[in-house]
Amino acid sequence: QEFAELLLSDEAVAPIGLGARDSLRLEAGMPLYGNDMTVDVTPAEAALGWSIPKLRRTGGERAGGFPGADKVLAELGGGAARVRVGLRPEGRAPIREGVAIWNADADGVQIGEVCSGGFGPSVGGPVAMAILPAGLAPGDTVWAELRGKRIPVVVADMPFIKPDYKR
């Protein structure tokens, strides 16, 4: 309580809620455990390959030796069948968690579903993330089924906004 009050005593600081945190996270392309990464999603599928240290990778000093190492290391070598991608729906309607993603605007096959999505205030439109087949590239079009209608969605690079911080 005392710490929060100290922070809020600065007029440049304002309290925010989970909605603000979530929109910032989405725009930054950061995954949320339980949505974009689960026990059924590997680090390679979640685009988190950087989290596996070089010494634990194939050929590293202490290669493998962690739960799921065989699968994870094979996928890091280029074998992931699906990956987390950014999506930019056309129009203003956000696509949210659970919305089906299809490979065609009519008929076609469901190829995944949105794991996180919402409105991105900094980009001025809806943004989303989904785990989809690995062959998709930025600029490719897929379709989201929203309220019984399929809308075009463009696969996009993440983060949706370019960071302006210094490393």
In which residue ranges do the predicted regions lie?
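Conserved, structured C-terminal
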Residues: 1-167
